[in-house]
């Protein structure tokens, strides 16, 4: 009989967010303040749902029917992305790949590279980066500590590395790389001949000119970086599923292979494309009315993050992030562990948050709050928290 | 710099269907009779598009908004599948996993198993089975010849094998396994402790009671088989994207691991779920009005397959399949090679078909016609073909 790929046994039993669901399952869900998983809570603007319905109705007529779409995504969407997100940046529509979500894309892309590659990830980090590399049998993983003393920004790796995962604005810490910070990493990758996986899932939350939205704003990044973007957080597509990645044609492996070419081969074999009506919904995000509607929602989330951040500070918590990000990284009090603080929040304040240690060892002593919640939930959470004595 | 995963260099340059697109690109597309890639051509029934639009509109209201869905798919759809497709078969909703397409599911599932596993595939076969195993570094691939003399049904492997890919009704040959044929394989898998990947993408085309729709109709198959199904061909979802797989909890690896448990871990890490409105569209396929509408479309495709099959026979071609399948497997005349016949059909008869040799060595000398075309296209194709002198 077939044997298991033993690399799978090296994973934790459960994916982090399911462990949290399990623990929360003992409470009445409706009375809990969910500041846990980063899922959207504001309705999707009508301008977007209309675009999806209108595209769906095209399929009920033979003359406008569409079957299999291009595995790379429809040109209309790739052009809209290029024209709106990569103005004055040397990225062409042919370097954009539309997909079903960053999780799927970023966890599969590593398959293209040699199994003995050295990988650098931040600690704490989004668990998918590490888990997908463990599943692929990679053992050479360098964890880059992101600590209070370095402002939660990683320091450059000590060893030679081949693949570097960077997420900015960061999940879970909410901290964003400035242009200067990011340039240091692009220069390092060039010098080291390393490839950066740049996860920009939260770029819509950036509020300062000093923080780049795209890694390609840094000169030369198109020789060393692949960028991931999503409609999940910017447009509420967590349940609709649409994302994209940017893979410049200039990218070559050390052994001289075009990464673009092999990635195309990879998706042609392993990927059936993204739902057509959903791609039309994503396209609508770039029209004037689409942009306005999304901006209204983003502003509500931003206000929520501000309220949560300031509320926590007024309760004497030390907090980070929450400015360019929907996430607030909060230090526990009295050196309480992340999971103890999680249990306390759940039992005494009816709050779900995500224990920092779930994102890596260096996350111990912290908890992640998500501001994807309505104002009332955040207010209730802060009121409940005020009553908790530590 | 990161090096390429060298297993990728063992693949053909282009995925088969893109090579065909390239060759067809020199012709005016509108005047070609496309009997090539198996893509639907009939409009999607309104009852389905309505379900998708109605679910989409739920998302524009906060009280009916849904964000991230369960990675395994919504219970409403898994229950509908179980109640309609697995009546009197010991499969529970918890053993069903909703996904974006069989291609993605079947190409990823092999990741769960040991890299040195022995794989058996039919020759000819759907290229994704082989390519995904090559990408994973598997070198022990046994090709099972499916030839005219064995009715295009594979004979049992000579060596010990761990993973067996079976597609019935078959792509590309259009031939279906009877209950007796399939039982032989289930028994073999049991004896050998092998795991069967059973691709049932075309089960909706089965017209005889003698041909099982599900491998689990064979007693004991739930100990040795994973089944893949899709809404692509049965309901026209090629552009909408929805499929599912059935993974019984009884399945264990030789080393005693629960495949269900590790697959759940796999998708939790690597998969963000299927679009909610599309899952509602799929659910609607199982209502009375949904079933009727789909049956109408299927009957049109079936008539097309019959017309094409009979037309080819009347032109003295030797054909197989086309009864339980939208595909007709046609022998070339005068021992012409598959690609020569492809070029001839393209240049002299304005027909696109798929060269049999593209599906494997044993496909040489054959061509695959798809009956996913309207009646007029099939008529024109047959008329054009009649004029071709060989």
Region annotations inferred by a language model:
Chain A
Residues 90, 335, 344-354, 358-390:
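PLP-dependent enzyme catalytic core of the Aspartate aminotransferase-like
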Residues 218-299, 306, 310, 388:
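Conserved core segment of the aminotransferase class I/II
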Residues 43, 301-302, 315-348:
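Conserved PLP-binding catalytic core of the aspartate aminotransferase-like
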Residues 279, 283, 298-309, 319-331, ...:
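Conserved glycine-rich beta-strand-loop-beta hairpin in the small C-terminal domain of fold type I
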């Amino acid at each position: 009989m077939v044997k298991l790929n033993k690399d799978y046994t090296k994973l934790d039993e459960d994916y982090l967010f399911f462990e949290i669901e399990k623990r929360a399952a003992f409470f009445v869900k409706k009375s809990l303040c969910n500041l846990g998983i980063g899922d959207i809570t504001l309705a999707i603007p009508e301008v977007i749902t209309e675009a999806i319905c209108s595209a769906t109705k095209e399929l009920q007529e033979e003359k406008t029917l569409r079957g299999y779409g291009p595995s790379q995504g429809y040109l209309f969407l790739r052009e809209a992305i290029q024209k709106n997100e990569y103005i004055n940046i040397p990225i062409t529509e042919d370097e954009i790949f539309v997909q079903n979500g960053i999780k799927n894309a970023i966890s599969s892309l590593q398959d293209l590279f040699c199994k003995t590659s050295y990988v650098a990830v931040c600690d704490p980090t989004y668990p998918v980066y590490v888990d997908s590399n463990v599943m692929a049998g990679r053992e050479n993983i360098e964890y880059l500590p992101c600590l209070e003393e370095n402002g939660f920004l990683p320091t450059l790796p000590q060893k030679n590395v081949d693949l570097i995962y960077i997420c900015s604005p960061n999940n879970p810490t909410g901290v964003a790389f400035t242009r200067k910070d990011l340039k240091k990493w692009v220069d390092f990758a060039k010098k080291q001949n390393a490839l950066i996986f740049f996860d920009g899932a939260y770029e819509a939350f950036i509020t300062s000119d000093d923080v780049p939205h795209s890694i390609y704003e840094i000169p030369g990044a198109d020789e060393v970086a692949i960028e991931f973007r999503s409609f999940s957080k910017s447009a509420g597509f967590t349940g609709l599923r649409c994302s994209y990645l940017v893979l410049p044609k200039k990218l070559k492996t050390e052994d001289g292979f075009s990464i673009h070419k092999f990635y195309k081969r990879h998706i042609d074999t392993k990927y059936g494309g993204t739902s057509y009506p959903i791609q039309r919904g994503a396209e609508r995000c770039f029209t004037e009315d689409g942009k306005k509607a999304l901006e209204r929602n983003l502003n509500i989330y931003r206000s929520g993050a501000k309220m949560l951040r300031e509320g926590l500070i007024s309760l004497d918590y030390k907090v980070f992030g929450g400015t360019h990000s929907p996430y607030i990284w909060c230090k526990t009090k009295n050196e309480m562990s992340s999971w103890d603080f999680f249990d306390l929040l759940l039992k005494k304040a009816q709050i779900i948050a995500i224990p920092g240690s779930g994102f890596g060892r260096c996350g111990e002593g912290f908890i992640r709050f998500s501001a994807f919640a309505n104002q009332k939930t955040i207010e209730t959470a802060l009121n409940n928290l005020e009553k908790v004595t530590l």
